[in-house]
């Protein structure tokens, strides 16, 4: 049974001695294919049997069309069978009956017409087509069938007559194109021109004018082509003017080496067409200038095209500073100093609509780029200085300021070898609108000049202005530390951590602790940790405290390589004491998340430095996750994950056991007292 389940397995996977090709398999399959069933051939002995068979089939077809009159397939099968029996009159009768049922069936008309054409009844077919196009003058398929039949019969005048009847209904472009192709096949070019004249009146789209011009280009003269294009431009007017027409006209003139004519056509069109409708025209003009113009002409075309584009966008929204940026970059690439200045002056004249800093952020960069361009490209230092001064005067410093512009002006003054002006600029900035970025830039400048006394004064001013800025305290202390004034750095740190409000106190404490640890003042570091733990019980502080205790070298090991020195038992003991203190605090305050993080760090410590017993002791304290439910304010319940600590369960179990024993003792005492009484 087991062997019969599933697909058969091939145990021997070696190649067969005789290989079989796909061709052999296909040939064998075809040879063995059984012949399809064929209907027996009916033979009629005399006319009576034939008439009896025909009568029976007609009765079947009549039943079909009677049951479902609107199905044209039944009618067409009936008529086709009559045609096979050479009963043309009966077939016509069937077709006519079908047309009485549904005279709008175009497929039925086509079948009827094709049947007459196949049986060479041309007049019948012509009469049918005439009926059809008279009733359904908007059905192009009938007209196409009509003109095709007349042309195949060699009746070209009749074909023209049919086309003229058709064109009187003003059909779509395909019908006109078929008429034009007919006349071209028989080299009747004057007739083609007359058809094009009528065609462009009915369908005056630019592409049809271009078709006419290309016909004249192939069979006419250059004057005729120009006449067609001129007539098209005059007929369409400025309202319906299209860039494709001008592109085709200009390319024709360029083909004839009439470059000035082509350039004039492009410029004529560009002056009259709006930007939105002349994208391809601009591109074609650029390509033309690249091919047949000089370099200046090409660059002028590109610049003028983009200038027009930017001017239109600025006209729509003059406060869009991104467009001004692109515009000035364009003019800078042209190298025309006066144009660049003009665009910059127009740009900075577009002041923001309100005195909100978010509106000024992009605008201020126009001034910055203007000043940099005057300094670096135009080499006009006096003008650059005036731009900085005007920009600073323009900013409403009582509401907001931009430290970048003050710092850039100071750097500009330094590049001009005027240090006093740079200091005056930054001093003015700090006095008018102090910012951390301004203090930082000014201090960095003085540090680069090795003016450390000035740096101290600036740090003092910054701390006086913003005593809650931890970065200022840290940088100030690092400056003193870099100058080897440890006591001064320590005093700065002490002042910093004593501030009642700090933006990021954890950074300041960490920097102070790292400073003391780097200096080897381990007692001071330990005292700092203790002071910090009085302010916060964050789990990271406890973990870092324990790690600090591990990394304290013993007296004789201080000079050894830090990677090679072993951790002493005393250091391990101190670290464990820190972990135990932290665990006790978190346990008492029921801080479960912090307690879990601490136990994980403690476990990692024991795995690195402890014994198997120590590791097992910690693992016994590791909690397990349990799902609990709590009630919400809207009387709904939600599930949450909680931690269950084995140590807590053991202590509560011991406590409950003691309570049971006390309760039992109390009962015994009560029973003894009742017996004595």
Curated annotation (Swiss-Prot):
GO term, biological process aspect, one: spliceosomal complex assembly
TM helices/strands, residue ranges: none
GO cellular component: post-mRNA release spliceosomal complex; precatalytic spliceosome; Prp19 complex; U2-type catalytic step 2 spliceosome
HAT repeats: 52-84, 86-118, 120-152, 154-185, 187-218, 220-255, 257-291, 301-333, 335-369, 379-415, 417-448, 450-482, 484-518, 520-551, 570-608, 613-646
Keyword match Repeat: yes
Main location group: nucleus
Keyword Repeat recorded: yes
Origin: domain of life: Eukaryota
Protein keywords: mRNA processing, mRNA splicing, Nucleus, Repeat, Spliceosome
InterPro entries: HAT, HAT_Syf1-like_N, HAT_Syf1_CNRKL1_C, Syf1-like, TPR-like_helical_dom_sf, TPR_rpt
Subcellular location: Nucleus
Function: Involved in pre-mRNA splicing and cell cycle progression. Required for the spliceosome assembly and initiation of the DNA replication.
Quaternary structure note: Associated with the spliceosome.
Record-stated family: Belongs to the crooked-neck family.
Name of the featured protein: Pre-mRNA-splicing factor CLF1
Organism for this UniProt entry: Paracoccidioides brasiliensis
Gene: CLF1
């Amino acid at each position: 049974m087991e062997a019969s389940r599933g697909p058969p397995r091939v145990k021997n996977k070696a190649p067969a001695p005789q290989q079989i090709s796909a061709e052999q398999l296909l040939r064998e399959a075809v040879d063995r294919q059984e012949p399809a069933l064929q209907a027996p051939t009916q033979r009629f002995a005399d006319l009576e049997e034939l008439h009896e068979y025909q009568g029976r089939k007609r009765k079947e077809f009549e039943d079909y069309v009677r049951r479902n009159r609107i199905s044209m397939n039944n009618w067409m099968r009936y008529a086709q069978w009559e045609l096979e029996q050479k009963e043309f009159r009966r077939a016509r009768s069937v077709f006519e009956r079908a047309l009485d049922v549904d005279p709008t069936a175009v497929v039925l008309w086509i079948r009827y017409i094709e049947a007459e054409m196949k049986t060479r009844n041309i007049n019948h077919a012509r009469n049918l087509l005439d009926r059809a196009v008279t009733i359904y003058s908007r059905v192009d398929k009938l007209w196409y069938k009509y003109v095709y039949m007349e042309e195949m019969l060699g009746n070209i005048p009749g074909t023209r007559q049919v086309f003229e009847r058709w064109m009187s209904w003003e059909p779509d472009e395909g019908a006109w194109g078929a008429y034009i192709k007919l006349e071209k096949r028989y080299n009747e070019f004057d007739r083609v021109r007359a058809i094009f004249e009528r065609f462009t009146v009915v369908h005056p789209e630019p592409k049809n004018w271009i078709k006419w011009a290309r016909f004249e280009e192939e069979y006419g003269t250059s004057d005729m082509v120009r006449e067609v294009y001129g007539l098209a431009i005059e007929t369409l007017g400025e309202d319906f003017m299209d860039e494709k027409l001008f592109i085709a006209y200009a390319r024709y003139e360029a083909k004839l080496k009439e470059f000035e004519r082509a350039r004039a056509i492009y410029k004529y069109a560009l002056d009259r067409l709006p930007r939105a409708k002349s994208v391809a025209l601009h591109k074609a003009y650029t390509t033309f200038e690249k091919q047949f113009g000089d370099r200046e002409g090409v660059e002028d075309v590109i610049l003028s095209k983009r200038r027009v584009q930017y001017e239109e966008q600025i006209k729509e929204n003059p406060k869009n500073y991104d467009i001004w940026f692109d515009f000035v970059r364009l003019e800078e690439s042209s190298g025309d100093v006066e144009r660049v200045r003009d665009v910059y002056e127009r740009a900075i004249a577009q002041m923001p609509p309100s005195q909100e800093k978010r509106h000024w952020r992009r605008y201020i960069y126009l001034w910055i780029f203007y000043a940099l361009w005057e300094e670096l490209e135009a080499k006009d230092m006096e003008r650059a200085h005036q731009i900085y001064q005007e920009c600073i005067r323009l900013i409403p410093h009582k509401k907001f300021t931009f430290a970048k512009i003050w710092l850039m002006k100071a750097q500009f003054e330094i590049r001009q070898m005027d240090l006093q002006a740079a200091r005056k600029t930054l001093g003015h900035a700090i006095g008018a609108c102090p910012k951390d970025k301004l203090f930082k830039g000014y201090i960095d400048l003085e540090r680069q000049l090795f003016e450390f006394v000035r740096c101290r004064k600036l740090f003092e001013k910054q701390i006086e202005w913003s005593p809650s800025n931890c970065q200022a305290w840290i940088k100030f202390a690092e400056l003193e530390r870099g100058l080897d004034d440890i006591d001064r750095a320590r005093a700065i740190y002490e002042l910093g951590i004593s501030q009642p409000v700090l933006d990021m106190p954890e950074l300041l404490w960490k920097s102070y602790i790292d400073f003391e640890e780097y200096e080897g003042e381990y007692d001071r570091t330990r005292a700092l940790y203790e002071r910090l733990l009085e302010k916060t019980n964050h789990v990271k502080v406890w973990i870092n405290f324990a790690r600090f205790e591990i990394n304290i070298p013993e007296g004789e090991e201080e000079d050894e390589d830090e990677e090679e020195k072993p951790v002493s038992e005393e250091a391990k003991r101190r670290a464990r004491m820190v972990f135990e203190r932290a665990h006790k605090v978190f346990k008492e305050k029921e801080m479960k998340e912090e307690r879990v993080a601490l136990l994980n760090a403690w476990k990692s410590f024991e795995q690195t430095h402890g014994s198997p017993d120590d590791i097992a002791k910690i693992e016994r304290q590791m909690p397990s996750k349990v799902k609990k439910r709590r009630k919400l304010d809207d009387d709904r319940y939600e599930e949450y994950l909680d931690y269950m600590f084995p140590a807590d369960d053991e202590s509560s179990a011991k406590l409950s056991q003691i309570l049971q024993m006390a309760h039992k003792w109390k009962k015994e005492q009560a029973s003894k007292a009742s017996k004595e009484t």
